Amino acid sequence: MLVFRVKNYYAPKEIELLHTLRLRAGAPKPKKQRYHLIRWKNVSFATYNCFELANIEHRALFKSKLDILFACVWNRDVNYYQHITESAARDLHCYVAQSNTSHYGGSCVLQPSRSSISNKIYVKGGENHCILTTTLDIKALREAQYRSFRDNNDIIKHNPPGFDYDALLERAKK
């Protein structure tokens, strides 16, 4: 099933490019920003397109509700987006998979764990296009989220303040 939506926020360079082509960004503009919470094969995820990820309030819409956040970016400022995705993995307490063009790099898969092991994959970029894969242990993430404590063997960090356990239980039921 394909699900389409108008982008909620366009980067300044995108708006500039559209204007040079005599186009307008996101017309017609929705009265309310929209994001999709998708449940597929018992995995809950949402997608953010590039500059949308920079809105902290909009990222917080899915706190406690996601297993994975997918971020599709096209931006040369990879450090800026790396910091945002690291924050999202910790604040939303979910995996974050970010894709960027191979020319810029910065594509990564992060998990909400200590910094030294939070990058499951990180691609710096270059001329060779490639596909890398990793396994995300959704079950282990949810089990760690359910427990109110962590032991020394846990790689998943403590839940952030305000984590909604009811939302976790609801997510696990479906």
Predicted regions and their residues:
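C-terminal functional modules
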Residues: 165-174
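Active-site catalytic loop in hydrolytic enzyme cores
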Residues: 1-64, 83-84
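CN hydrolase (nitrilase-like) catalytic-core segments centered on the catalytic cysteine
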Residues: 44, 53-158
